[in-house]
C-alpha cells in the first residue's frame, strides 16, 4: 500500500499548481494559433510546445541546475546556497537575492549546484546555448539576409527614410513603458522598457536578441508578443493605413524601378556593415550577420552556403530557438502584471511604427519630385515580406492595376536594417546606464 501511495505522490499531476495549469492552457492556445490559424507557425509551434513541456510538474525540463537544487535539494544544500548570498535559507528569498546578484556569483552558484549532482533540464540547456550566448537570433538573421534582395532599396534609396521613420514606434513605446512606471501602474525599468520597445520593429530575432541582453526575465512575453503581432500584420495595419491616407493617395502609381547591377548588390552589404559598425559597434553582431547572409546570396560563388543558410540552417536553429523561448513560459515568470503591459505596449508600438511610416511618406510627397504611394510607408516595419504584401493588397483594392509589392520591399528591407541599428543604439546607451 505504501508503495502505491509513493507512486501516486510521485505523479506530476499531484504537484500541478494553478499557475502551471494556466500556462499549459496558454501554450495549447499558441499551438492552436500556429496549427489551425497558421499564425507564424514556424516559431509559435515550437514556442507553444516548449511552454507545454516547461510547465509539466516535477519534470524540470526548463530548470537550471541551481533551480533544480532549490526545488529538490535538502535543507543543508539550500542553506549553503543561502549563505553564499547572505540571505535566509528559503527558496523564495534565495531567488530574490539571485535576481540582484552579479553574473559572476550566479555562475559560481550554478557550478556549485552541478557539483552537488544537479543538472540543467534540456530546455534550459537549449536556452543557454541558443539565446544565452546570443547564437540563435544571429544565425537566423544570417538566414534572413540570405533570403533578402536589396534591389528595391538600391533602386529607390529614399525608401530608407521610410524604414527609419517606422522605428519611431520603438522609441515611443520606451517612453510609454517609462510613463507606466512613473505613474505606478506597472513597474518597468529602463532596460525592460527598451526591450519591450523593440517589439515595434516587428522583428522577432531582434526582439529576442535585445531582450536576452537587457531583460531576460521578460523574454518569453516579449517573444510571444513580437511574433503574435507579426502574424497579425494583415489585421492591424490596413485600418491605420486607410485612416491616414485619402483614396487619391492610395491610388498613386509609382515610377518603374530601375535595374540594379550585381556589383551594387555586392558592394552594398559590405559598405553598410562597415560604416554602421565603425559608428555603432553594438549593432555589428546583428547587422554583420544579416549582411554576411546577403553577401552569400549576391556573390554568386557560394551557392551551397547560400542554400544552407536560407534553408537547412535557419530551419534547424528555428527549432531550438522556439523551444528555448518556450522554456521561459513558466508560470512564475509569465503570469505577472508586466506581461499584460508588454502585450498592450507591443500593439501600441506596432501601430505607431505603421503610422509613422505612412506619415513620413506623405511628408516626402511634399518635397519630392516623384510621388510616393504612402501605403508603402507602412512596410517600414521589418515584418518581411508580410508588411510589403499588405501594402500591395491595400493598393490593389483601390486600383487593380497598381502593383506596389516591389516598391514596398524597399522600406521593408530598410526596416530590418533600422531595427538592427535601433537595437544597437539601445544596447550601447541602456547598457551603459545599467
Curated annotation (Swiss-Prot):
The chain crosses the membrane at residues 13-35, 122-144, 159-181, 186-208, 223-245, 266-288, 308-327, 339-361, 403-425. Its EC number is 7.2.4.2. GO terms for biological process: sodium ion transport. One of its GO terms (molecular function) is lyase activity. The keyword Flavoprotein does not apply. Its cofactor is Na(+). It catalyses: oxaloacetate + 2 Na(+)(in) + H(+) = pyruvate + 2 Na(+)(out) + CO2. Heterotrimer of an alpha, a beta and a gamma subunit. Pfam families: OAD_beta. This is Probable oxaloacetate decarboxylase beta chain. The gene is oadB.
Amino acid at each position: 500500500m505504501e508503495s502505491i501511495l509513493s507512486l501516486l505522490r510521485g505523479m506530476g499531476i499531484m504537484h500541478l499548481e494553478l499557475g502551471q495549469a494556466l500556462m499549459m492552457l496558454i501554450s495549447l492556445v499558441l499551438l492552436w494559433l500556429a496549427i489551425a490559424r497558421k499564425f507564424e507557425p514556424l516559431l509559435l509551434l515550437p514556442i507553444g510546445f516548449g511552454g507545454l513541456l516547461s510547465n509539466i510538474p516535477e519534470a524540470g525540463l526548463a530548470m537550471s541546475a541551481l533551480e533544480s537544487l532549490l526545488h529538490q535539494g535538502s535543507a543543508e544544500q539550500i542553506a549553503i546556497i543561502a549563505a553564499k548570498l547572505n540571505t535566509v535559507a528559503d527558496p523564495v528569498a534565495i531567488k530574490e537575492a539571485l535576481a540582484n546578484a552579479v553574473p559572476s556569483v550566479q555562475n559560481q552558484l550554478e557550478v556549485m549546484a552541478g557539483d552537488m549532482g544537479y543538472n540543467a533540464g534540456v530546455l534550459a540547456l537549449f536556452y543557454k546555448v541558443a539565446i544565452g550566448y546570443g547564437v540563435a537570433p544571429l544565425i537566423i538573421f544570417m538566414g534572413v539576409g540570405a533570403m533578402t534582395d536589396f534591389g528595391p532599396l538600391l533602386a529607390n534609396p529614399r525608401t530608407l527614410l521610410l524604414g527609419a521613420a517606422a522605428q519611431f514606434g520603438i522609441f515611443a513605446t520606451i517612453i510609454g513603458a517609462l510613463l507606466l512606471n512613473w505613474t505606478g501602474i506597472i513597474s518597468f525599468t529602463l532596460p525592460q522598457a527598451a526591450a519591450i520597445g523593440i517589439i515595434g520593429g516587428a522583428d522577432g530575432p531582434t526582439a529576442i536578441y535585445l531582450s536576452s541582453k537587457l531583460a531576460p526575465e521578460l523574454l518569453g512575453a516579449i517573444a510571444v508578443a513580437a511574433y503574435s503581432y507579426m502574424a497579425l500584420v494583415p489585421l492591424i495595419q490596413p485600418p491605420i493605413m486607410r485612416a491616414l491616407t485619402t483614396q487619391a493617395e492610395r491610388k498613386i502609381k509609382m515610377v518603374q524601378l530601375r535595374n540594379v547591377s550585381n556589383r551594387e548588390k555586392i558592394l552594398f552589404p559590405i559598405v553598410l556593415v562597415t560604416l554602421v559598425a565603425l559608428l555603432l559597434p553594438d549593432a555589428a553582431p546583428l547587422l554583420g550577420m544579416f549582411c554576411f547572409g546577403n553577401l552569400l546570396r549576391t556573390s554568386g560563388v557560394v551557392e551551397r552556403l547560400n542554400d544552407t543558410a536560407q534553408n537547412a540552417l535557419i530551419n534547424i536553429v528555428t527549432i531550438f530557438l522556439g523551444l528555448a523561448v518556450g522554456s521561459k513560459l513558466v508560470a512564475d515568470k509569465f503570469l505577472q502584471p508586466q506581461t499584460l503591459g508588454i502585450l498592450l505596449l507591443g500593439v501600441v508600438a506596432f501601430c505607431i511604427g505603421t503610422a509613422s511610416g505612412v506619415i513620413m511618406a506623405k511628408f516626402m510627397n511634399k518635397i519630392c519630385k516623384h510621388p510616393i504611394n504612402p501605403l508603402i510607408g507602412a512596410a517600414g516595419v521589418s515584418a518581411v515580406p508580410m508588411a510589403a504584401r499588405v501594402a500591395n493588397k491595400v493598393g490593389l483594392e483601390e486600383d487593380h492595376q497598381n502593383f506596389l509589392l516591389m516598391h514596398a520591399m524597399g522600406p521593408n528591407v530598410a526596416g530590418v536594417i533600422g531595427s538592427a541599428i535601433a537595437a544597437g543604439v539601445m544596447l550601447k546607451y541602456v547598457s551603459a546606464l545599467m
